[in-house]
């Protein structure tokens, strides 16, 4: 096993070998979830604190279930009623929590880099559950596991990521991971929703679905992140769906066995046709949710192993 990280702050810090180690461990948990659900309780005696400064349904629930499956004592902090609302800084929050000696901190924050700032102030393992537009590493890992299970490999695939790339931490983490695993990545969307400097990311950029989806193995749709927009990026949702919403006609140029992905939450009729999202022969959207629990179990288990080793050596 090769996984030498103290925290999981982003895909950028992971090697190809570490990614494979995480996915292999997650696949073991995924199979156990479909069978005995016996994971051995490797986190028994450890405390996991979930701190979500942004709203979340899937990610927070997934981390909570993952921790409980592994035997951790899980605490969800209500950030809306915490001392942060009274003016406490993130650093003071980190120092306060550190004094309580937690073992795992799962953090989502609206500002890029905030999770790294917190990790520098605590003695436990920190997991980035999404920080601003920066990264969402466990989403990219669960997407990778979903792809690997559906396609039998995670290399030399044509992967299209379509939609609001500019505001998406999911896109950034997936681009980093899929690039490290030697895939061909295509970004599709209106130029107003492409980040500056995207031409230097080692990807292909298209503003036309027919060209971008041609011969693709994987089609990953992203929602319009209106909460991060500060201007008019599209003429209207109707026009956006006409040009960039995934439907059967647009998908027809992809490979016959191409899979459809979406990190959620979905806006049906905006970035994807509802019938296509529910197509059991093409859509792996529910599998993504399922793999999320397995991936988060693997990440926390490996970080906990490293944490225990460091404490034993101290």
Curated annotation (Swiss-Prot):
Entry annotated with the keyword Cytoplasm: no
List its EC numbers: 2.1.3.2
What InterPro entries does the annotation carry?
Asp/Orn_carbamoyltranf_P-bd, Asp/Orn_carbamoylTrfase, Asp/Orn_carbamoylTrfase_sf, Asp_carbamoyltransf, Asp_carbamoyltransf_Asp/Orn-bd
Keywords linked to the UniProt accession? Pyrimidine biosynthesis, Transferase
Where L-aspartate is bound, by residue? 86, 169, 223
Associated pathway: Pyrimidine metabolism; UMP biosynthesis via de novo pathway; (S)-dihydroorotate from bicarbonate: step 2/3
Q: What class of enzyme is it?
A: transferase
Q: Which GO terms describe its cellular component?
A: cytosol
Q: Which GO terms describe its molecular function?
A: amino acid binding; aspartate carbamoyltransferase activity
Gene Ontology annotations of biological process type: 'de novo' pyrimidine nucleobase biosynthetic process; 'de novo' UMP biosynthetic process; amino acid metabolic process
Reaction(s) catalysed by this chain's protein: carbamoyl phosphate + L-aspartate = N-carbamoyl-L-aspartate + phosphate + H(+)
Q: Where does carbamoyl phosphate bind?
A: 58-59, 108, 136, 139, 264-265
Q: Name one Pfam family in it.
A: OTCace
Cross-referenced PANTHER family = ASPARTATE CARBAMOYLTRANSFERASE, ORNITHINE CARBAMOYLTRANSFERASE, MITOCHONDRIAL
- Binding partners and assembly: Heterododecamer (2C3:3R2) of six catalytic PyrB chains organized as two trimers (C3), and six regulatory PyrI chains organized as three dimers (R2).
The UniProt family comment states: Belongs to the aspartate/ornithine carbamoyltransferase superfamily. ATCase family.
What is its biological role? Answer: Catalyzes the condensation of carbamoyl phosphate and aspartate to form carbamoyl aspartate and inorganic phosphate, the committed step in the de novo pyrimidine nucleotide biosynthesis pathway.
Q: What is this protein called?
A: Aspartate carbamoyltransferase catalytic subunit
Organism per entry: Jannaschia sp. (strain CCS1)
Identify the coding gene: pyrB
């Amino acid at each position: 096993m090769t996984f030498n990280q103290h925290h999981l702050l982003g895909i950028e810090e992971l090697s190809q070998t570490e990614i494979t180690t995480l996915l292999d461990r997650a696949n073991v948990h995924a199979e156990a979830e479909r069978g005995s659900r016996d994971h051995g309780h490797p986190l028994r005696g450890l405390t996991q604190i979930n701190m979500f400064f942004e709203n979340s349904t899937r990610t927070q629930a997934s981390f909570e279930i993952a921790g409980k499956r592994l035997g951790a004592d899980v605490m969800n902090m209500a950030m809306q009623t915490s001392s942060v609302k009274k003016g406490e800084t993130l650093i003071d929050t980190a120092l306060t929590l550190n004094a309580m000696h937690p073992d795992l901190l799962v953090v989502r924050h609206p500002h890029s880099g905030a999770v790294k700032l917190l990790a520098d102030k605590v003695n436990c393992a920190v997991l980035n559950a999404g920080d601003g537009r920066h990264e969402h590493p466990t989403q990219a890992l669960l997407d990778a596991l979903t792809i690997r299970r559906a396609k039998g490999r995670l290399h030399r695939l044509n992967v299209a990521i379509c939609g609001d790339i500019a505001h998406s931490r999911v896109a950034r983490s997936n681009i980093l991971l899929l690039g490290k695993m030697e895939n061909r990545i295509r970004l599709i969307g209106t130029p107003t929703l492409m980040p500056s400097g995207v031409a230097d990311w080692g990807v292909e950029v298209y503003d036309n679905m027919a060209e971008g989806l041609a011969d693709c193995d994987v089609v990953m749709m992203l929602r319009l992140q209106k909460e991060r927009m500060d201007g008019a990026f599209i003429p209207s949702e109707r026009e956006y769906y006409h040009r960039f919403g995934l439907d059967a006609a647009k998908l027809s140029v992809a490979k016959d066995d191409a899979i459809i992905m979406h990190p959620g939450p979905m806006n049906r009729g905006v970035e994807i046709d509802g019938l296509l999202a529910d197509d059991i022969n093409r859509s792996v959207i529910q599998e993504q949710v399922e793999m999320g629990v397995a991936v988060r179990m693997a990440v926390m288990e490996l970080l906990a192993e490293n944490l225990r080793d460091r404490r034993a050596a101290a």
